[in-house]
Amino acid sequence: MRSVFLICRKELNSYFASPIAYLLMAFFALIFGFVLFNATRDFIRYSFQMQFQGGGGPMSINDQIITPLLGFTSTITLFLVPLITMRLFAEEKRSGTIELLLTSPVTDLQIILGKWLGAMLLFLCILAMSMINLALLFAWGKPDLKPVLVAYLGLILQGGCLLGIGALISSMTKNQIIAGGVTFFVVLLLWLLSWSTANDTGVLSQVLNYLSIVTHFDNFAKGVVETKDLVFYFSMIFFSLFITSRAMESLRWRA
């Protein structure tokens, strides 16, 4: 485990040694804050309108602001993941340092886990920017905490799944641009699968719908944890990292 920790720390340090980590955090914080501001403004406006018109009970902050906002955050990850993972292995291969890793006394699994965990920690740092903004909502409106925590669990699992896919693609090329572009295409495809099967109930449509990352995050966004969603995310993480290990083994033999 010490080797995994050292590789993870090295990977995380490399992110923060360049502008990429700060740019991604700033980009995410800016977009999230802008969407939150507009959602909160609309919520307050509609609340006043309902009071003046003698409407029903109070509007739900969870339903009207937080759930749609975290759903939007799920969409932003499609753009963040390729930028995080495109350099994981591609840069090592381009610079020739991958040979040093492969000939060092560490296993392929330790290398892959260390790099994936480093990417995950950066993703969590980016995600933490949203928690700072949401803290203001909790100070102001007292929303229900449990659905928010479940939604964040879904975001973390979805992020881990997509980062695993990105790591796999990065291990197959030495060009960061190609790695980032292919990763974006793949995660976008997984995101769009549920839309393509919306009006179809056939077996193939059910399979494609199950493979869609949106389908599995929807339950988390509603505050619901289902076993099938956990199995999907953990299976995708395991599968992508396993295939990455096969790619690394091939590189080791060539090295």
Locate the predicted segments by residue.
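Long, hydrophobic alpha-helical segments
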Residues: 65-91, 126
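Secretory targeting signals
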Residues: 32-37, 57-71, 113-174, 225
